[in-house]
Structures are given as C-alpha cells and as structure tokens.
Design a protein with these regions (language model features):
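A glycine- and charged-residue-rich anion-binding loop/surface
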Residues: 1-869
Length: 869
C-alpha cells in the first residue's frame, strides 16, 4: 500500500464511521497567538475542544500536516525524526468515547490495512481499568501484549486532560535489545509507536485536582510516515514512497549512493525532510525572514543548502526537488499544487541569496575553529557566532551544528547579548511611531456596556487615565486616555489610523490624537485636555474630523481594489503582508519576488481606476467567519478575528474581512495613482499610492513639470520626450569627446611617469604621482603604464582636494616573484593617514593627507624593495 493510499484509506474508514472528512488545516495557526506553527493533529481543532467554537460536526477526521523543529538536530540521524510530517487523526467532541475509539483503531489496523495482530501491543494508564478491559476483554488482546505505564496520561498544565493508550508494532527481536523483558516503553527500537489514543475526560483545576468533564472528547494521532514504513516493510520513514524519491533525486544530483556512507545518508535524509517542510510552509504563506515563522523556514532551508554542500553540490539544487514533493503530496495537499510556481521562486531566491555568502561564511568559520583549536579553546565566542549570523546569514543553530561536529560548544549567551545590542541600536535609531500608550486597569468596567457607533453624538465618560493610573479629573494641558460608554471614533486597526477630533464636556475640551483598542476590544481615546477640565461621569459630545476620515475611507477602499488588482495581474500568490491607511496616502506590502514592471503597474492602475469609474456600491455584511471564508473573503495574515466578522466587498471584484472605514461607492475615490513600488525584504514588495485630492494634486504637479521642461527645451509638451532625448544624446557625445581628450593628455604624461622607473633585482618598478582627478582615471593611467613596461609593478598616487588615492598593479610574472599590490598600497596609504589593500596583482587605497604624498610613495617604494630584495 502506498503512502497516499494509506492516507485515503484512513480518512475513508473514519468517514464511514460518521466523521466529517476535512482537508489539512494550514500550518499557520488560525487566530491562535499561543502557537507559532501547527505541530499536531489536534492543534487547529483546539477551539472545538475548549468550547470556544462549535465544530461543524461532532466527529472529524483529518490528515494534518505538522511542523516540529525542537529536535531538528536529530533529523537524518534517526529513523523517525522529521521537521515535517502528517498526523492522521480521528476526533470526537462530546460524541463517542473510549470504547469506540479503541474498537475502531483495532478494526482499521487489522481489517483495513491488515497488520498482523500478533505484532500489535498497547500501553494504558495504570488507573485506566476501562481501557485495559476494553483491550483485553473486548478486543481479545492477551495480557502479555498490554503494559501499564505511568507516562500514559496527557496533560499540559491546567485544563482538559486524560489518560491515553498507545499502540505499538513489534519490529522483531533483531531490532531490539537483549533484555528478555523488553516491551513497549523500552528505549530500544523494537517496538514502534504507531498510534496514540487520548481520552480527554478530566479537567485539571488550578489546585491540581481532577474533575470529570461533562462532555468527554477523543483526540487520536497516527503518524502517516510511521504507518507507511510498517506497511512497506522499510527500516525507516525515509525509505517509504512518501520520501525516498526525494533522496534518490538528491543522490543523483550529488553523484552519491544511498546506504554506502553514514554521513552521506544523514545529509540525504536532512534534505529530503527539509524540502517537504519548505514546500508546505511557503504554500501556507510563510516567507523567509529573521523572525517568527519566517525564521523557522529560513533556518530549515539554509540547513538543507548546507547539507547539499556536504554532499559536494556546489550550485542551486532545491528547486527541482519542489516538483517531486508536489508530485508525491499534491493529491492530498492541494494548495502546494496551486502555489507550486510561487514556491519554486521563493526557494530559488532564498537559495541564491544564501549561496552568495555560504562559501565565505564556511571559510570564516573553518578558520575560526582552527584558531580556537590551536589556542586550546572549546567554545566559540558569541560575538563570532553573531558575526556569522549578521554578515553571512548563518542561523546560530547552523553554526552550533557545525561547531558541534568539530567538538566545540557555542557561547549562546554571548550571541544573544550581541543580538540584543543590535536590537537596541535599531530601536533607538528609529522613531517608535507605534509605541503603545499606557492604559489603566479597566476590570471595574466589566459590567458596563461599552460600544462603538459612528453615528453617536453624545455619551458618558467612564474612565480617565494618566499613564497607567486612573484619575477622576484632568486639567488643561494633561495628556490622557479616555473611555466613554459609546464612541463614534474609529480605532486603529487593519493598517488604518485612528480617528482624530474633539471630546467636548460641560467644563472643557479634549483634543483626540488617535483612537486605539485594548486587547479585549474596548476603544480608548488618546488625547490632551486643551480647554478647562474633563471628569469621570461627564456627559460629553463629539466632533470627529469627518473630512480626515473620508480621506482615509477613500484610501482604505482603494487598498482593497489594489489588492484584488495585484492578484489579478501578478497571480494568486500575492498576499497582503502589511498595510498603512492614512488621510494622505496608502501603503500596501505584498508577497511577490520580482519588481513590478512599468507595464504591470500601468495595468494595475488602470484596473483600479476602472472600478472607480464603474461607481460600484460597496456591500458590507456581518457573518460567521466560516461563511465569509466560504464566499472567498480574504483575511489579513496574522490578524485576529472573532466568530462574527465584517465583510466588505466590491461586487464581482473584491471581498475581504475588514473592520475599517470605507466609501459607500467606489466613485467617491475619485482617482488612484501609484507613486512608488519597491522591495522591502525577501519576497515582499511595497506600493504607495494616493487617491482623491492628493491624486489630483499629483497629476497637476506632473503636468506643470512637463510644461516647465517643455519651455526649457523649447518644445511642445507632447514633444518633450523626444527633445529631452536629443539633449541627452548630445551630452553623452560631448562627454565621450572629453574622455578621449583626457586619455590623450594622460598618454602624453606617460613619458614623464616612465622616466622614474627603476629596477629591484630583475623586477621593473614605476612609482610616481600623476595629475588626474579621480580613481577611475588613476586606474586607467596605471593600466597604460603597466602595458607600456610589459613586466613589472606600478604604484601611482593622485592628490585631489583633501584626499589622496593610490593604485598598484603588477604583471603575473612579478607576482610570482613576491610582489603583492595589496600590501604595497596599504603601506602607501597608511603613510598618508589612510588604509586599504587588495589582491596581489591589483589594489587601491585612499589617504587623508595630500601633503604626505612624497612620504607615501617612498613607503610604497620601500615595500617593493623589501619584497624583491
């Protein structure tokens, strides 16, 4: 049975038992900030287990793609460790329980995939007599095949927990130890765990007591790759048809053979495992970066590249492996087929970036380890680890792995200290425009009905805060945070800035600089008392800056139109990576791996303006998040959403989850103009644009610029491009003539320069100062002198303003006699207050003291003499 057939058999079996069969959830957790990535079958179903959300069915079955990197160093070194794997699972939310879970597991293993009953063993929790009796009395498993283990209890702190029962397959005594009592739970490889059945029946309280749950749940997990290895009679998961084709392709590329060398096998397995993780992560929207999920991806990808180098692969090699992963898994994980081309572009880009620095980084690390070894050291200093990370892109874990292979440990504390220093410098170097405003405790307002209503004209002050302290009254000049019972101010969110305006009380006025939301959703106002005073329980009125909000509404709706246009023109791989909506302009960050061409930008602009000209009425609805996703609504990556969401759509063009301000009709936007496009990171581009009055002002400014240029070149506006091109062509021709004149003048100076040539032993040398204006001319002059003498070394200096430049060139034959241009210019430059260096045959440097030219050239001459003499 193939791995794909096994997956389908499992899902079909549990579907026949009344389970809703669902495709794997994304590796990126949906609205769960406690998880970086999905690492188990039950993880995306957690809201159903906790009761936060109602499941679509009380029985669900999945084959959940999962990522775990906690023991990444073991991948390739054992038969079972992976960063990426699939977890087969069947789940019950207050429906069936222990007996059914055990019976169905046994039925699937023995009747569907027909495993040998004699080779199946189980473990149960010592106090779980019900599970023991079910296995022994109902299934008929002999007592010798059932073990009671204290470890068979699943819990993570407070909350739902319960005993579990693990199912093992006996791989045979030849895979085990010599202990005659060997059984499941032994550290040897004989008994392979293939399935874990968790019976969630208790709630652990804060006091550590266990209370029975009113609704008991079932959570099971069976590793697809493990089960496949048993069915296909393979010694490791890597040799199953789910992974081995990748190993074969990599071995062919590297010119090596699997199972002939242990270290070679490790690298082949690492690459095969990691490329599966890479494909799945990128297809789910994760891009390489230095933080969070992106760092996990970058670390995995660069580790794979490094193991390619260990196999002798020098160039890029990962992209063709993407196709193999898609061929194997695409039938079950459909989004990797849809995103296949995009995944390959991301992999190619990241692999190329790392390859540019990998060789240099490995050389530096090798030299560092040699030096440390010679000094008798056993720890790599944290500063050096940080330099490898900062300069060569080495994740510290990669440096740690290489160092460990050479017998060294890593100064992790020193590395983290250097990282923190860099973060501090970066933080201090930029203005923290997103700084959080300290807010007082609002738990005492829990019984108040606090709401947002853009039509509200009056309300009551519930709380005034000064920093983290609640106060009863604020006077003129005080900076405050204010919470009112009902507010018309729109809070920051989804990239849109908060509203500004005034809160007016009976005795004073507060200028509102922005509105923000607390984590639980309450809107608070950040402002300054500008007249009189404001007090708790004051009845207040509002004056929102409506014109400013309208400008933001234009830009926010235009952002939605831009997003849809980008996906239409560039491809569905485009996803929002960030946005900023201000009254003056909009900024949109999106995933794409090449500059957007001028033609594409024009097409995108035209598409957005076409929607504006259509004057479509926006549709705004509130619905369940599942209904919104079913309609194709796009969600902002990383944004938290409740069970009910607001959906904003432009009919037949755009549909997104959004809580921001929008125009009622696209025609109100006026017009849309893109002002800039550029890259801001690996695979992320940024577009800035303007709408409405700002777009009109830009058009008028550009029109006036064209008219001004037309007047300068004495042409009509429509003739400006051709006329300016004529001027540029003429200027280039004049520039070429000037260059030729300079070369002729320099050539005329050759005789004077050559007059100062001398010999040291059998090496001809020329050391001289020449009257040229820049480094380019100096190099040209040195070229001519070297060509003229045929064999030898040339050192030329040129003073200009408050600096001096040096160039040294040597023919190959004299380099073989000991001449090194890098050391020659270094000596000259240091004599003139500078520094520099370079290759043995060519080098350049600079100095700060033109008056020291003679001493500098003399120092260079002495260096030449010492090299030959």
């Amino acid at each position: 049975m193939t791995g794909n057939e096994l997956r389908q058999a499992y899902l079909n079996f549990f579907e026949s038992k009344g389970h809703l069969k669902q495709e794997s959830y994304s590796l990126v957790p949906d609205n769960d900030p406690s998880l970086l990535l999905i690492g188990a079958g039950m993880a995306p179903l957690k809201p159903f287990f906790t009761g936060k959300l109602v499941p679509p069915c009380t029985r669900i079955t999945t084959s959940q793609k999962s990522i775990r990197t906690g023991d990444i160093e073991n991948v390739g070194r054992t038969a079972r460790h992976h960063t990426f794997f699939e977890m087969l699972g069947n789940f019950s939310f207050g429906d069936y329980f222990k007996k059914e879970a055990i019976h169905w597991a046994w039925e699937f293993l023995t009747e569907v995939i027909k495993l040998d009953k004699e080779k199946l063993y189980v473990t149960v929790y010592p106090d779980d007599q019900e599970a023991y009796d079910t296995w022994h009395n109902e299934i008929g498993l002999p007592e010798s095949h059932i073990s009671r283990l204290e470890d068979n209890f699943w819990e993570i702190g407070e909350g739902p927990c319960g005993p579990d029962s693990e199912i093992f397959y006996d791989l045979g005594p030849e895979r085990g130890c010599d202990d005659p009592n060997c059984a499941p739970g032994c550290d040897c490889d004989r008994f392979l765990e293939i399935w874990n059945l968790v019976f969630t029946q208790f709630n652990r309280t804060a006091e550590g007591t266990y209370e029975p749950l009113a609704k008991k749940n079932i959570d099971t997990g069976a590793g697809l790759e493990r089960l496949a290895s048993v069915l296909q009679n393979k010694e490791s998961n890597f040799e199953t048809d789910l992974i081995f084709p990748i190993i074969e392709a990599t071995a062919k590329k590297a010119g090596v053979t699997y199972h002939t060398d242990a270290s070679t096998d490790i690298s082949l397995k690492v690459i095969a495992d990691h490329i599966r993780a890479i494909v799945a992560l990128i297809a789910d929207g994760v891009l390489p970066s230095n933080e969070g999920r992106g760092y996990v991806l970058r670390r995995i990808l660069r580790r794979a590249v490094r193991h390619g180098r260990l196999l002798g692969i020098q160039g890029p090699f990962l992209v063709p492996l993407v196709d193999i992963v898609v061929d194997i898994l695409g039938g079950a994980i459909t989004n990797i087929v849809e995103k296949q081309d995009f995944v390959k572009r991301v992999v190619a880009n990241e692999e190329e970036r790392f390859n540019q620095t990998l060789a240099s980084g490995l050389d530096m690390l090798s030299q560092l380890l040699d030096t440390l070894k010679a000094d008798g050291a056993t720890t790599v200093p944290g500063q050096d680890v940080f330099k490898l990370y900062d300069t060569y892109g080495f994740p510290w874990e990669l440096t740690e792995e290489i160092a460990h292979e050479a017998g060294f440990t890593i100064d992790q504390a020193g590395f983290e200290s250097a990282m923190n220093e860099q973060r501090t410098r970066a933080r201090e170097a930029r203005e923290d425009v997103d700084a959080k405003v300290a807010t007082p405790d609002i738990t005492h307002l829990s019984n108040e009905h606090i709401s947002d209503d853009e039509s509200a004209t009056a309300s009551t002050v519930l709380l005034i805060g000064e920093g983290a302290k609640a106060i009863d009254r604020a006077e003129d000049g005080q900076d405050v945070t204010i919470i009112v019972k009902t507010t018309p101010f729109h809070a920051e969110g989804g990239g849109q800035l908060g509203d500004t305006g005034f809160i007016v009380g009976p005795l004073g006025k507060v200028e509102v600089h922005t509105a923000k939301k607390l984590p639980e959703g309450t809107t608070y106002h950040v402002g300054t008392v500008v007249e009189g005073s404001i007090s708790v329980n004051d009845e207040v009125t509002f004056a929102v800056d409506v014109e400013r909000r309208q400008h933001m509404a234009r830009n926010h709706t235009a952002t939605h139109l831009l997003h849809a246009a980008l996906r239409s023109v560039l491809g569905t791989h485009v996803n929002q990576a960030g946005s900023l909506v201000t009254p003056d302009y909009l900024r949109f960050d999106f995933t794409h791996f090449s500059p957007v061409t001028a033609e594409e930008l024009q097409t995108i602009t035209n598409m957005v303006n076409e929607q504006i000209l259509r004057a479509s009425t926006l549709e705004v609805e509130t619905m369940s998040i599942d209904a919104a996703k079913a309609q194709g609504a796009m969600a902002l990556f990383g944004e938290k959403y409740g069970s009910e969401v607001r959906v904003v759509s432009v009919p037949e063009f755009s549909i997104e989850l959004c809580g921001g301000s929008h125009v009622e009709n696209t025609g109100f936007i006026g017009q849309f103009r893109i002002t800039s496009e550029g890259g801001i990171g690996s695979g992320v581009r940024r577009i800035e644009a303007v709408t409405g009055k700002a777009a009109l002002a830009l058009a008028q400014q550009e029109e006036q610029t064209v008219k001004s240029v037309a007047a300068l070149v004495k042409a009509k506006p429509q003739e400006v491009v051709g006329k300016v091109q004529q001027v540029l062509d003429h200027a280039k021709a004049v520039e070429r003539e000037l260059e030729q004149v300079k070369k002729e003048l320099n050539s005329g100076n050759l005789d004077g320069v050559l007059a100062g040539q001398f010999t040291v032993g059998d090496v001809t040398a020329v050391v001289a100062s020449v009257p040229v204006s820049d480094m380019g001319e100096l190099r040209d002059m040195a070229d001519m002198v070297r060509d003229k003498i045929g064999s030898g070394v040339v050192l030329l200096g040129a003073a200009g303003g408050d600096k001096v430049n040096f160039v040294c060139m040597a023919t190959k034959d004299v380099v073989g006699k000991g001449i090194h241009c890098g050391n020659i210019v270094k000596a000259a430059a240091q004599a003139a207050g500078g520094n520099g260096g370079g290759r043995p045959d060519m080098a350049q440097a600079g100095g700060k003291d033109p008056a020291a030219m003679d001493q500098a050239l003399a120092a260079g001459k002495e260096t030449i003499q010492s090299m030959v003499g």
